[in-house]
Swiss-Prot record:
Gene source species: Levilactobacillus brevis (strain ATCC 367 / BCRC 12310 / CIP 105137 / JCM 1170 / LMG 11437 / NCIMB 947 / NCTC 947)
Residue sites binding Mg(2+) per the record: S103, D243, D245, D247
Name recorded for this polypeptide: Phosphoglucosamine mutase
One GO CC term, this protein: cytosol
Protein task: Catalyzes the conversion of glucosamine-6-phosphate to glucosamine-1-phosphate.
Length: 451
């Protein structure tokens, strides 16, 4: 697939992801949806939303025009989070949802991401049908006039429905907690005060004033430094940072220390298991989750299943094997009992609920996970697969793993997009991990590296 990456169509807005391309993605996507719709409904309904970047309206208007040209009934949600779209598609009974976002990426990027009617990403088959139309030399799709055209209306109550849904995922309110919030000047900016005020939280915010250009700019889950200072300055019990489209959440404890997605998954998984709510006592993680998390899980009889890097692989494994908690170190955490995708606000409520009912500080809850120093080195290679199977490389990995003796781990994997081999290790100290990675990377360079 050349247009749809793991997260839909992405690129620099108005240069790679042009309004012309957005129009086609709307038109061809809408057409494929009408082909798959049941016969009673001549005008399938599609929800459209965006994050706060300046290019959002440009792309939204082009995309909506494309959808209308093939008879789609469009409901515009305005600025809202990606997981809100996934939730509303299911509960609204729409044929699909479209989110215009580039998530945690810089402001000049944007993307178009489709959700199917079940709230999961579109099936590969449907994406391939859309791609085939995008690649066709001519556009031979019908061009209806009058009653064959679609209509568009604003669906402003969508965000209220989503907030009500979130509030119902925990048993009681959260009064007595003082929290600090960083909305990354993104999609959660307009939702946090309504949600947290409803739950009687005492909250202070930063980065909740989007201006179209400041999304993710030195704020949010990928830049938590401001929040770490803010938590300590405000004397908050916890800090919560979201990313641009609100599908990630990471936390900061009362001392200003980072509590990443691994630690949040562990805290939530342990609590769910204690209350008989963690299916198969298992958390689904990616290969990048830290060894410290696995050690803490083992100590409390929790199982783990590892997938490739990417939240879509986590969700696939959860659906296939019947698990209900999974996620990534980056803060993409999926509570499949409640929503079909990573949901930052949902994650924040589950964590705050645990904080309130246990009466423990976040630093105490996170203390079980001793994060191992991690080092990653990229080595340029001519052939990724040959590099992986090279006997010398294999031998050095085996030697290092033997020396680690269970107190460390090695992960060597090809980059998904570049001619690189990624050499990663975790070990108890910065010095040892650097030495281990250095030894493996040296052998990779000597055997199969290119300058």
């Amino acid at each position: 697939m050349k247009y749809f990456g793991t997260d839909g169509v992405r690129g620099v807005a108005n240069q790679e992801l042009t309004p012309e391309l957005a129009f086609k993605v709307g038109r061809f996507g809408g057409y494929v949806l009408t082909q798959h719709a049941d016969s009673q409904n001549a005008h399938p309904q599609v929800l459209v939303a965006r994050d706060t970047r300046i290019s959002g309206e440009l792309l939204e208007n082009a995309l909506v025009a494309g959808l209308l040209s093939v008879g789609i009934e469009v409901l515009r949600l305005g600025v809202i989070t990606t997981p809100a779209v996934a939730y509303l598609v299911r509960t609204q009974g729409a044929a699909a949802g479209v989110m215009i976002t580039a998530s945690h990426n810089p402001v000049e990027y944007n993307g178009i991401k489709y959700f199917g009617n079940d709230g999961y990403k579109l099936s590969d088959e449907m994406e391939e049908e859309i791609e085939a139309l995008l690649d066709a030399p001519t556009d031979d799709l019908p061009r209806p006039t009058t009653d064959g055209l679609g209509t568009v209306e604003d669906y402003s109550e969508g965000s209220q429905k989503y907030i009500q849904f979130l509030e119902q995922t925990i048993a009681d309110d959260l009064d007595g907690l003082h929290i600090a919030v960083d909305s990354a000047n993104g999609s959660t900016s307009g939702l946090v005060s309504r949600l947290y005020a409803d739950l009687n939280l005492d909250f202070d915010t930063i980065a909740t004033t989007p201006n179209g250009l400041n999304i993710n700019d030195q704020v949010g889950s990928t830049h938590p430094e401001q929040l770490q200072k803010f938590v300590v300055d405000q004397g908050a019990a916890i800090g919560l940072a979201f990313d641009g489209d609100g599908d990630r959440c990471i936390a900061v404890d009362e001392e200003g220390h980072l509590v990443d997605g691994d630690k949040i998954m562990y805290i939530c998984g342990k609590y769910m298991a204690e209350h008989g709510r963690l299916k198969k006592d298992t958390i689904v993680t990616t290969v990048m989750s830290n060894l410290g998390m696995y050690k803490a899980m083992e100590a409390h009889d929790l199982q783990s299943v590892k997938t490739k890097v990417g939240d879509r692989y986590v969700v696939e494994e959860m659906r296939k094997s019947g698990y209900n908690l999974g996620g990534e170190q980056s803060g993409h955490i999926v509570f499949l009992d409640f929503n079909t995708t990573g949901d930052g606000l949902l994650t924040s409520l589950q964590l705050l609920h645990i904080l309130k009912v246990t009466g423990k500080k976040l630093s105490e809850l996170a203390a079980d996970v001793k994060t191992y120093p991690q080092k990653l080195v990229n080595v340029k290679v001519s052939d990724k697969q040959a590099a992986l199977t090279n006997p010398q490389v294999q031998a050095m990995i085996a030697t290092v793993e033997k020396e680690m003796n269970g107190d460390g781990r090695v992960l060597v994997r090809p980059s998904g997009t570049e001619p690189l081999l990624r050499v990663m290790a975790e070990a108890p100290t910065e010095e040892t991990v650097a030495a281990y990675v250095g030894r493996i990377a040296d052998v990779v360079r000597a055997e199969v590296g290119v300058e």
